[in-house]
């Protein structure tokens, strides 16, 4: 079963993290044919972490997880950390 994991930076501001969760819910509704499972995760400053997000997908039955980076610009994390 295919899963989509939305990965955002994460923020100390809870409202920003909540916006990522709202986006994941919208993706879940619009991508249901291709991705039966959709979760969000964060690189830092918020939970779930990326490994936890992958575990959540697997727990829900995923056999394949597609990572969707959600960053607004090409900073250090986008260029160096995410590809690793």
Residues of each region from the PLM?
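Active-site-proximal alpha-helix that buttresses catalytic centers in soluble enzyme cores
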Residues: 1-84
């Amino acid at each position: 079963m295919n899963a989509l994991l939305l990965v955002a930076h994460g923020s100390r501001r809870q409202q920003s993290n909540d916006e990522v969760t709202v986006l994941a819910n919208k993706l879940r509704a619009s991508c249901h044919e291709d991705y039966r499972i959709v979760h969000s995760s964060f690189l830092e400053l918020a939970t779930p972490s990326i490994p936890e997000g992958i575990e959540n997908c697997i727990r829900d039955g995923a056999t394949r997880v597609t990572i969707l980076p959600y960053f607004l610009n090409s900073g250090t994390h986008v260029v160096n950390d995410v590809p690793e």
